[in-house]
Amino acid sequence: MAKWSYSSLSLFKQCPRKYHRLRVVKDIRQEDNTALIYGKEAHKAAEDYVRQDTVIPEKFRYLEPYLNILKKLEGEKLCEHEMGLTKDLEPCGFKDKNYWWRGIADLIVHHNDTAYVIDYKTGKSSRYADVKQLQILSVATFKHFPKVNYIKAGLLFVVSKDLIKTNYVRNQVDSLADNFRFDVERLDKAYETDVWNPVPNFTCRKYCPVTDCEHNGGYV
């Protein structure tokens, strides 16, 4: 049984060989680029501000208006909230040995039967926004918070000032989880057969750390 997260499954879908080298063999590392470092710092600034009113660093001050709106929502606010699910979609700890999926919600605000699930994005455009990340986070939220029956989820693009919204109800849990079954089964099969074929993609030429792959721009 392959364990997965939204990011690891996305990596596998992009290129099984890249996934294998980074997540299985672990003989190479993906160095953090400027955009990734910036995103991590922005997430930390948002977490500290919502959790404990820590002053936001000047370069992230543009986040404050959006975070103030979120802070005014009624309910308990959980920042960088870790959740896990077993293969039977039962809630478990993020670090439990029997976890099947795990993920971190940037912000969950829950009150009575309703929860907000927010993921911050620091990319310059929301053009290719993928709400599937919200789908699996919402499944986990329903499972970890049994009193929640309604979820208002959103990808908050703080740079482009866009909010990609979607709503879910509890009886959608199974159908939302099914959206990932095909790709997870492919991942299981790759582990079973130890076959990790490369898939040429936009990262090959300049951004892939698997430099000994024939599709890599630095391959000799």
Predicted features and spans:
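Residues immediately flanking
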Residues: 16, 105, 111, 120, ...
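Nuclease catalytic cores
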Residues: 2, 6-55, 80-81
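A short beta-strand motif that forms part of the nucleic acid-binding face
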Residues: 121-124, 170
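Short amphipathic alpha-helical face segments that pack within enzyme cores
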Residues: 41, 132-140
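Active-site metal-coordination segments of metallo-dependent hydrolases
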Residues: 32-38, 124-131
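Catalytic cores of nuclease domains that cleave nucleic-acid phosphodiester backbones
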Residues: 45-117, 125-127, 132, 143-154, ...
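Short amphipathic alpha-helical segments and their helix-coil junctions
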Residues: 1, 16-29, 114-118, 183-194
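Metal-dependent nuclease catalytic regions and adjoining charged, substrate-binding loops involved
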Residues: 3-4, 86-91, 97, 129, ...
